[in-house]
Amino acid sequence: MARYMLLLLLAVWVLTGELWPGAEARAAPYGVRLCGREFIRAVIFTCGGSRWRRSDILAHEAMGDTFPDADADEDSLAGELDEAMGSSEWLALTKSPQAFYRGRPSWQGTPGVLRGSRDVLAGLSSSCCKWGCSKSEISSLC
């Protein structure tokens, strides 16, 4: 009787997965833990992979010949460009870059905005290292 109880206990233990080989190697339920260089490589692979370039090429091919008469207008546009470059406004802007930027808000006035994406990256990298993250979370950085 004790022998059957021991076999029953052993069977329950095996069925719960405690003795299966690979039970220790299961992935974390949240995602893959990536720290340091591995996190950066995963971001580069996800954001700069061939999938993104391929989608750009396919989108361009799908557009096809959207502007068939663009070549005919090219000569007239080139003439207008030469005329505009000879104007006094263009010459004033090329001689004085400050005149172009006068009256526009400076990027130096909002340093918090520039650091925002960097803070998101730092937060996601530390959480990916501690708890793991999914590919969709990494692709949110693209």
Swiss-Prot record:
Residues 1-25 form the signal peptide. This is Relaxin-3. Its main location: secreted. InterPro entries: Insulin-like, Insulin-like_neuro_ligands, Insulin-like_sf, Insulin_CS, Insulin_family. Residues 55-118 form a propeptide. One of its GO terms (cellular component) is extracellular region. It is found in: Secreted. Heterodimer of a B chain and an A chain linked by two disulfide bonds. The keyword Secreted applies. One of its GO terms (molecular function) is hormone activity. May play a role in neuropeptide signaling processes. Ligand for LGR7, RXFP3 and RXFP4. PANTHER family: ILGF DOMAIN-CONTAINING PROTEIN, RELAXIN-3. Disulfide bonds join C35-C129, C47-C142, C128-C133. Pfam families: Insulin. The keyword Glycosyltransferase does not apply. Keywords: Cleavage on pair of basic residues, Disulfide bond, Hormone, Secreted, Signal. Belongs to the insulin family.
